[in-house]
Amino acid sequence: MSYNAAYSNNKPINKRIQEAKELVELYKNYIEYFRNKDSKKVISFADLALLKTIKQNMQEHKKANEILFAYPKTFEVHNEFHINWEFPNDSKLGDFPCKSLLDRVMIDHTNKKVVLVDIKTTADVYNFRHSIEEFDYCRQLAYYWFAIYWYFKNELKLDLEEYTRETYIIAVQSHDGYEVKVFNIENQYIEAKVCVIEDAIKRIAWHKDNDLWDHIKEYYEGDGAELL
């Protein structure tokens, strides 16, 4: 043993064991780092300070604190909630497989309430409303709600229509103080995107059914001209 070789054999075995234990205790954080460095990402002190600032800003924001930290105990909370689900599809391939990774889903079975929370970073938190439109975040949230509907029906054996639904985007500025704002996305804006999701998935399913990917569906079904 290398530790044995480094010490005089004249030392009592109990003494050497005690010193070894003291060394392990002294360097336990260092040892733990090397044990986990391949499976866990180690962040810098600068990144740690940044995350602490963002957390503090969230805790000091009334609504962000409510949905991230000070929520009622009746909620069960799922962070980075991965759902493998299926979209109903009448084709030779059957239902279309989908995947969703939701930042945060809060389910309160006692009060029949489901809260979907999406966290975004932005260069300008004050103009984030424009980002919602530019990047069509409501379409993304509609896709997430499809996943939640499937989860309720197939995993929980419950009807989501019996629950009230709330959707929030927490926007965090990516510089200069990391300010936080929370946006309540009303159901009407999400429901307006349901048909967009349905059309997109049906189109993808058609291409998969027919193994045709170079052009849009209308190209193959028509004369090759595409409508604007």
What positions do the PLM features span?
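Short alpha-helical interface patches
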Residues: 47-56, 111, 187-192
